[in-house]
Design a protein with these regions (language model features):
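Acidic/polar loop-and-plug regions of large Gram-negative outer-membrane beta-barrel proteins
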Residues: 1-34, 47-78, 122-150, 158
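Repeated loop/turn-to-beta-strand initiation elements of outer-membrane beta-barrel proteins
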Residues: 38-41, 95, 172-176, 219-222, ...
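Structural signature of Gram-negative outer-membrane beta-barrels, strongest in the C-terminal barrel
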Residues: 78, 97-109, 152-282, 310
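Outer-membrane beta-barrel signature, preferentially recognizing the C-terminal barrel domain
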Residues: 3-31, 152-156, 228-310, 342-347, ...
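Conserved C-terminal beta-signal and adjacent last beta-strands/turns
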Residues: 100, 224, 260, 342-449
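Gram-negative outer-membrane beta-barrel transporters
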Residues: 272, 277-281, 293-379, 446-448
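Residue-level signature of outer-membrane beta-barrel architecture
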Residues: 33, 89-91, 166-169, 204, ...
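Transmembrane beta-barrel strands of outer-membrane/channel proteins
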Residues: 43-49, 102-108, 178-182, 222-228, ...
Length: 449
C-alpha cells in the first residue's frame, strides 16, 4: 500500500493506556599509570542495571487511511558488567619507531524478559489525524513469562584480546599499523515461560586489522585501513508484522564483518575536513513463513565528507554528508538480491553554522540544516518515505555570575513546523515509521563550577 501522510506532529495518536517507564543505573571508572617513561598501563570497568516496563499499542495504517492496533505489554531487566585493561609501550628499533598496544576486554550481559499480546486481529483506532480512544484490551492471546517476575531469556559473554603495533617511518611521516584480535562470543537464549534453553553458541575467531597513514604535509594526510570483527548473531523477534514468529528468541550464528576505508584529511589549524570512501558489511535477517532466519548480508559502500573549524574569526562551521550505496547480497534464493535494505537513505547531510555577534560580547547565534533522503519501507523496494529537510535555529549568551561562567540558551527546532516521517526501522517485517518532532522551543542554562 501507499505510505500514509504524516499527521500533525504536535498531536497525539497514542492510546491513553500506553506508557513506557525505564530506569537505568550505570557507572564507569578508568585509571592509567605510567610504569616507566615509555610504558603505560590502564584498567577500566563499569556496570549497568536497567529496568523497563512498557504498555504499547502502535497503530497499523491501511491503504484507505484507517488505523488499527493490538496491545503489547512487556517487562525487561538488564544487568551488564564490563572490564578492560591494557599496556601501551613506545620504543625504537633503529630508525623505526614503535607504539605497541595490548589490551583485553570482557563484557557480561544477563537479560530478563516477559511479554503479553492482545488478539493480533486488533481493534480500530480511527485514523492518525482523528484517533479514537479505546479501553485497554486483555493481553491473553500470546503470553511469554510472568510480567511481575521475568525469567532470564538471554545471556552473553564477549571476551577479546588484541595486540597491535604502529610503526613509524621517515621521521613520523609514514605510519603503518598491524594487529590481531581474538574474540570469543558465548550466547544463550531461554524460553520466557519455562526458562528452558532454546539456542546458543560458543564461537571464537582471530581477525586482522591493518592501517596506513601518509603525512604528505603538515596539513594533509592520506590514510587507509582494513579490519574484520566477529559480530553477535541476531535474535529472532517474538512477533513481526502482527504475526507470531515460530522461532522467536532464537539466536542466529555469529557473523564476520569487514570494513575498508580510504581517505584524505586536511587540518589547517582553524579549519579542516575529511573525505573518505568506505565499504562495510553486516548481516541481514528476514521473516518468511513466520520463521526468522539469516538472509545474506547488507553491503554498504559510500563516500563521506566532513568539515569543521573556524574559517573566519567568529564564524564556525561543522557539517558532513554521506552518499551511500546499500545493497542486499547473498540472499536466500536471490529474494530481494541487489535491493536497498529497509530504512537506509542514499543521502544524508547536515550543516551547523555559528556566528559570534561582535556588537554584543558573549552572544552567539547558530543555525542547523538536516537533510535525509528517501527510505524504503519494504525489502522489495516498492514503497518509500519521502526525503525531508529540517531547519533549527538557536542563540546562546555567555556571562559570569559571581565569577561563575554561565551560559543561557534558547533553541527552536523544526522552525518551519514540517510534518515528516523521520526514519524507518523495526524488526524485519515490522516496518515502523518514526514521526519527526514538531516545532519545539526550549530554554536551558548551564554553569561551570
Amino acid at each position: 500500500g501507499d505510505i500514509p501522510e504524516p499527521p500533525d506532529a504536535s498531536g497525539n495518536f497514542a492510546q491513553p493506556f500506553t506508557f513506557s517507564d525505564e530506569k537505568q543505573l550505570f557507572a564507569a571508572a578508568r585509571g592509567e599509570y605510567d610504569l616507566t617513561g615509555s610504558v603505560t598501563a590502564w584498567i577500566g570497568g563499569g556496570f549497568r542495571e536497567g529496568e523497563e516496563e512498557n504498555d504499547l499499542s502502535n497503530p497499523r495504517v491501511a491503504a484507505d487511511g484507517s488505523a488499527s492496533a493490538f496491545r503489547f505489554v512487556n517487562t525487561r531487566e538488564d544487568s551488564v558488567r564490563s572490564i578492560d585493561a591494557g599496556l601501551r609501550a613506545e620504543f625504537e628499533t633503529g630508525a623505526i619507531g614503535h607504539s605497541v598496544v595490548t589490551s583485553g576486554t570482557f563484557v557480561d550481559l544477563e537479560s530478563k524478559n516477559a511479554f503479553a499480546f492482545s488478539n493480533f486481529g486488533g481493534f480500530s483506532t480511527g485514523t492518525l489525524s482523528n484517533p479514537v480512544a479505546v479501553t485497554a484490551p486483555a493481553t491473553d492471546a500470546f503470553i511469554g513469562g510472568d510480567l511481575a517476575n521475568p525469567l532470564v531469556t538471554e545471556t552473553s559473554e564477549n571476551a577479546s584480546f588484541a595486540i597491535a603495533d604502529t610503526l613509524s617511518f621517515a621521521q613520523g611521516r609514514l605510519l603503518a599499523t598491524a594487529g590481531l584480535r581474538y574474540q570469543n562470543i558465548k550466547t544463550q537464549s531461554f524460553n520466557a515461560t519455562s526458562g528452558d534453553l532454546t539456542s546458543g553458541y560458543d564461537a571464537g575467531k582471530v581477525t586482522p586489522a591493518f592501517g596506513l597513514v601518509w603525512k604528505a604535509s603538515s596539513q594533509i594526510s592520506l590514510y587507509g585501513n582494513y579490519a574484520e570483527n566477529l559480530q553477535p548473531g541476531a535474535t529472532a523477534p517474538n512477533v513481526s508484522g502482527g504475526v507470531p514468529v515460530t522461532n522467536g528468541g532464537e539466536i542466529l550464528d555469529p557473523f564476520t564483518g569487514e570494513q575498508v576505508e580510504v581517505g584524505l584529511k586536511y587540518d589547517g589549524g582553524d579549519f579542516g575536513g575529511t573525505l573518505s570512501v568506505f565499504s562495510v558489511n553486516r548481516p541481514n535477517g528476514i521473516v518468511e513463513n513466520q520463521v526468522f532466519s539469516a538472509d545474506g548480508e547488507q553491503r554498504n559502500q559510500g563516500i563521506e565528507l566532513s568539515i569543521f573549524g573556524e574559517p573566519i574569526t567568529g564564524f564556525r562551521v561543522l557539517g558532513g554528508a554521506t552518499v551511500l550505496d546499500n545493497q542486499l547480497e547473498k540472499t536466500q534464493d536471490g529474494i530481494n538480491e541487489g535491493n536497498t535494505s529497509i530504512g537506509t537513505p542514499e543521502f544524508q547531510g547536515n550543516i551547523n553554522l555559528e556566528y559570534d555577534v561582535a556588537a554584543i560580547p558573549g552572544l552567539t547565534v547558530d543555525g542547523r540544516v538536516v537533510h535525509t533522503g528517501k527510505q524504503f519501507t519494504d525489502a522489495a523496494n516498492t514503497i518509500a518515505v519521502e526525503d525531508w529537510t529540517r531547519l533549527d535555529l538557536g542563540v546562546r549568551y555567555a556571562l559570569e555570575v559571581n565569577q561563575t561562567p554561565v551560559t543561557l540558551r534558547a533553541r527552536l527546532e523544526n522552525v518551519t513546523n514540517n510534518d515528516y516521517w523521520a526514519s524507518v526501522g523495526g524488526f524485519p517485517g515490522a516496518n515502523y515509521l518514526i514521526l519527526g518532532n514538531p516545532r519545539t522551543f526550549s530554554l536551558s542554562a548551564s554553569a561551570d563550577f
